[in-house]
Amino acid sequence: DVQVWKVEGRSVLEVQIPRSASRPHFCEDENGKWQAYLRREDRIHRASPVQVKVWQYEMRMDRSEFRYDQFIGKLFNAWRDGRQLRFQQVARMARLRYEDAEDLLCLLIVWNIIEWERGARGLVYQLADASALDELETRGPEQFRCKNYS
């Protein structure tokens, strides 16, 4: 769908592109490095490694295993208390290697338990659905594995 708008004497081309079923897509940047990008509020941002993994997780059913321990519980409580956490804070609080923290965040985002937001401090992660988090803690991850999240 294409439309041309006239704004302050200029022509603005608006193109509606349907959501891709095979995300993520990469393009080569000026340094020859392949990057994924996303558009938010009329701005283009380079996708974080977590966002790229989220897109990859949405496209496949075999996902990382979820494990729960006292440190993950501490992380969940911080989100319940309304905290917005940067990636490094999530990894440190949950005592996870960065790759494992990426996997955890991806699962929780795909399962619609947490969401990310781009703020003044960069990307932050926050609780999206407290009841889903409660369900994950009480009933386990099997409740979420069979659902279609894409």
Model-identified regions with their sequence ranges:
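Conserved N-terminal catalytic/coupling substructures associated with nucleotide/phosphate chemistry
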Residues: D1-S150
